[in-house]
Amino acid sequence: TYCSFKNLMKTGDLFGVDMCYRKIPEELNPYDYQAFSENPTEFYVVVTNCKTGEAEYKKITDMHRGIHYVRASSSLPLLSRTVWIKNTPYLDGGIADSIPVKQSEKLGNHKQVVVLTRQRGYRKEPNKAMPAAYLRYQREFPKLVARMKNRHLDYNAALDYLYEEEKKGNVFLIC
């Protein structure tokens, strides 16, 4: 099953992991792994390290080997299981860095196009569903919970930075 609450109750993942990361790319809509590997464009995913609460930026050069990081980068708290890679627990990168424009700058991208999924002027408020996540993760990953509690502040600071960079001509925003 691709997506169902039955999946969530049975496996801990709203989206079927086997369906998303094996059946679709291997059988139903074959992914061109060779074309990906041969493409000179650098491809990064952002994951949140649950132990540190910090964003990590993973360069994917081989999608077969990197698919676990892709999965982790889209694993939402409470809707997905934590993804363990080399004894490190990861969740969605948006927890620690929702708009990774500063990391992109560190990689040398000084003129950027950023697509925002909300209208201009949007400000993130604390998520009302997060107390359930705090309870779920507090004992095992206190730094992750601390990051979650400040996510709206981090997101709004990233927006402020984007608007300033837009004024300077360094960022083109699509809202």
Over which residues does each language-model region extend?
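Patatin-like phospholipase
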Residues: 1-175
